[in-house]
Each structure stands twice: as structure tokens, then as C-alpha cells.
């Protein structure tokens, strides 16, 4: 396979050298907001006569680099913004092809590391202890330690992490014991081992006053004690989802599958850190209705973590396949009509995102070109929903779900422990369906993969569960003022929370509505009393877009009480677009910026055109 350049990394590419293993020893300092320690990288040369190599770093202080007991020369290049600074290391001997060397780098992170959020005790549920969590995807691992920060390189890792003894440390690895810190009796060392090779964006660390509850034979749920019961209840379907996922994807190779419920500022719905999925507390709806996010993160154990996009241009390979598996898991649990309902909801989400970007925007392509583009800035639902739509279309073209799931399982088996591009995927698709090449040649590949805007074909969807949502939304959108008295709470009696959410999504596509309609909607349905985060989010967007001033404090509260970017960014954007709340939105952002996650703060600042 020709080497594909990773334009998001400044490190030596995988064709020059490959990191095979990391041994991390570090100490977590809450007072200084730093990680200090050593990263020992076992690197294998991929070429003859290798005399130097380059690693990614970002805002790191390097104390020294040691190889074979000797300090060696290194240079830290100029900072290149979001990409960080290249670190070139001179090797004491020229390496021959396949020769390995251990490079031990002493480093310290910056308090403003883009990979870490440091929470004060006041920002936690327990209010007693500080909290730290990392988020490395896409290219923030370099802000924790020097590495080849590209998904084209996979490594195993071991770690020893020293933390205050009243706290617990967890990583994206198997827990491997704990002991008092011999250098400081007020501290404890936690040990970890990840034996499956992973891209370094899956390295993860959390430190806090964490407790756990067992919810399955291979699953503990971890959180602060205030959330642990609620979380155990919310995610009780985890083991049944894992079993279905194994049936669809093949054996689960990671051993443990734990869940960590983070503080509200966690910027994503979930992060598929191996052995320890991170999830937002906004999933705690009380009725398990948002558990599709767990199905999604479980599915990444195959698509993403075992078979990985080679560069972030091909991110859709991770996310499209994972959404496809997620919806099959939910289909097995709740029926095929439910799978189609979510698939069609996803198509609506895709339409919304394309409308937001503009239909000729390059970020609406399935395969993107991230040369000089920060992956955090390009991030959207496109790789998820356009990717899913392509796979769903292929499923229907090639003979249905069982046939296409056969392909997916074979794809995972073929490319496990590797990193792949769209061309690798497409070649394998053609070889797997060699008897259906005529059908595959009907696909407008160029438009699907490389053109912006909506896909060339819309798949077929069963609309059984969606029809009620559309019908009710149509009633509201077409209602005249004199029709408003015809609405009542009985309208909702046969709708699930998933359908209620879809109803609001449908109305939101037609927003704004007359203010009288919105007030009547609140009067009969009392949406302000609903705490389900997805429903509340769409309801508050509808209120602000329809210019209901009374909703401003509620929308500001939701935008700041939690920091899941899916909710926080659109709420701030809507508030900024409404003249009555524009200044308040900017002021509230500036007030909260210092306590926000670094990536969230950066992106909301861009959205609001401040900073």
C-alpha cells in the first residue's frame, strides 16, 4: 500500500519508524496542573541507516532525552499552532531496518494542555476533591507526551501514575494494581497495562474521587459516588449490548469493558477509550433512552479501535461503521423498525449539518482534506451520518442486513490491529462482493466519497415509527392561531421519548414558529419540565429560534451547566443570533471560558467570533 501522508502530524511517518510500546511513569500535580514524568518509547526503524527521528509535542517542557543510559541531542521546533512543535531526536547509533531502540524522554505538561481538563473541587459533584480527565482524540495526545501522534501507528502501553492517595486513577487499559508511592507517603501509584496495540489518540487518563459498581461480568461503572447508583441503573443493558456486538463483529479482545461517567464539562457524548469508555452525564435520562451512545462506544471496540482510520481524512471509516453497528445493536434489542427510525433520524441530522455548513462546503465531503485544518474545527455529524447512509445504501443494494453484516465481520477480521484508508476499504468491498461487481459499479463512488453536499441517493427507510412524529409536527407547523386550542397533552400519549425527540427535530427544521405557537406548546406539553437532555436541547433551540425571551435564561443555563459540544455550541450560536440575547451569550461565554474544557472554549469562541 502506498504511504498516505498524515497532514495532522509533524512526526516521522510510519514508513520511517514505528513506536511499538510506551512505558509511562508520571505524577499528577493538581496544585500546578501538570503531569511530570518519563515516556519510554520503544521505536522500531522501518528503514536502513536511521540517524534521527521526529515526534509530535504540544506545549510540553522537555527536560532531557536518554538512550542507552546516555543523554542525546534533541531540538524542539517552532510551534505550528494546533499541530504543536516537532521534536527531532538524534540517535546515538544509526539503526538498521527493524532494529529497535528505547528512547526515554523526561517531560512536563503545560497547565493549558489542550488534552487535559483540570477541575476544581467546586466543579465536581462531591465538592471535596479536584478532578482531572484527558481527551486525546483527534490530535491532543502530543499535549500529554511526545509521540507519533497519528492513527497510522499503533502501540501497546504500560503506565505507573502517582496521585494523591485519596483519589483513584484509571486509564484506557487493564488495571494492574496499586501501591503506596515510595517517594511520598501522601500519594499512591496506580499501574496499568494495555496489551492490545492502539493508536495514541486512545491513551486516556482520569483522576478523581471515583467509586465503582459492577453491572456485568466484564463491566464496572465508575463515577463520583453521587452518580454511581443512577449510572449503574442507566447502563444496565451494557452486557446484552456487548454480546450482540460480539455476534456482529467477532470476539471482544480487550478483556474489560468499563464505563466512566464524567463531570458535565466532558465535551463529547462518549469516547471509546479501550477498556474504559468515557461518557457524558447528559446520558442519565432516568429511563435508559439515551443508551444508543453506549451501543455506539461498544461498537468502536471493533470499528475504530481494532480497525482504525489511517489518517483523520478517513475518519468516516471509524464513525460510519460504528453508527452502522450501533443501529444494528439497537435493532436487535428493540426491533428492525426501531433501527430504521434511528437511521431516518440520522438522515435528518445529515440534512441539518449540510444546511449549517452550506452544501458546497468541503467539510461536508465524506473523505475530507485536512491539510492545514484542525480536526476539531472540521468535526461534525458528517462522517457519522453520511458514512452510515453510504453503508445503509450498500446494505440495500447488495442484498440486505445479513449479507452486509457478513461483509462487516470479514472487514474487521481482515484489518484488525491495522490502520486503513478509504481505498483499502473499497478494494476489500469489491473483493468480498466479487460476484456483485456489476452492482458495485452502479454506485456513484466519486459523488458519495469526494463531493460536498447531500449524497446522490437516499436509502429506503421504514417510516412506521417516524410517521406519528411527522404528523404531529405538520399539525403545529401548519396551525393557524385559531387552531391552537385543538392541541392537548393527549397528542403525546402514544409517543416514546425517542419519538418526542424526533417530533421536536422535525419542528426545528421548520423553525422559527410564531411565538404564540411556542407558548401554547409549553402550555399543553410542559416541555420545560423535561430533563432528557436531547429533548430539552431541541426544545430550547426551538424557543430561542422562535424568539421567546423567557427561554433565554434556560438556554444559557443548559449551555453552561454541561459542556457536551453537541448541545453547547448550537445553543450559544442560537443565543448569539437572537438580538435580545446576543450580548448575554458573549458575556456568559467570557465569564465561563476559564472553567470550560479547552477544546469547547476554543470552538465556542470561534462560533461567537470572539477571541
UniProtKB/Swiss-Prot annotation:
Record site feature (Covalently modified during suicide inhibition by leukotrienes), residues: 379
Catalytic residues (UniProt): 297 (proton acceptor), 384 (proton donor)
GO molecular function, one term: zinc ion binding
Pathway assignment: Lipid metabolism; leukotriene B4 biosynthesis
UniProt keyword list: Acetylation, Cytoplasm, Hydrolase, Leukotriene biosynthesis, Metal-binding, Metalloprotease, Phosphoprotein, Protease, Zinc
Modified residues (N6-acetyllysine): 73, 337, 414, 573
Site feature (Essential for epoxide hydrolase activity, but not for aminopeptidase activity) residues: 376
UniProt key word Amino-acid biosynthesis: no
GO cellular component: cytosol; nucleoplasm
Catalytic reaction list: leukotriene A4 + H2O = leukotriene B4; (5S,6S)-epoxy-(18R)-hydroxy-(7E,9E,11Z,14Z,16E)-eicosapentaenoate + H2O = resolvin E1; (5S,6S)-epoxy-(18S)-hydroxy-(7E,9E,11Z,14Z,16E)-eicosapentaenoate + H2O = 18S-resolvin E1; Release of the N-terminal residue from a tripeptide
Residues where Zn(2+) binds: 296, 300, 319
Traits of the deletion mutant: Deficient mice have normal phenotypes. Inflammatory reactions are reduced as are some other immunological responses.
Cofactor note as given: Binds 1 zinc ion per subunit.
GO BP term, pick one: peptide catabolic process
Keyword Protease: yes
UniProt modification remark: Phosphorylation at Ser-416 inhibits leukotriene-A4 hydrolase activity.
SUPFAM superfamilies: ARM repeat, Leukotriene A4 hydrolase N-terminal domain, Metalloproteases ('zincins'), catalytic domain
UniProt record similarity statement: Belongs to the peptidase M1 family.
Subunit structure: Monomer.
Stated role: Bifunctional zinc metalloenzyme that comprises both epoxide hydrolase (EH) and aminopeptidase activities. Acts as an epoxide hydrolase to catalyze the conversion of LTA4 to the pro-inflammatory mediator leukotriene B4 (LTB4). Also has aminopeptidase activity, with high affinity for N-terminal arginines of various synthetic tripeptides.
Protein name: Leukotriene A-4 hydrolase
Species: Mus musculus
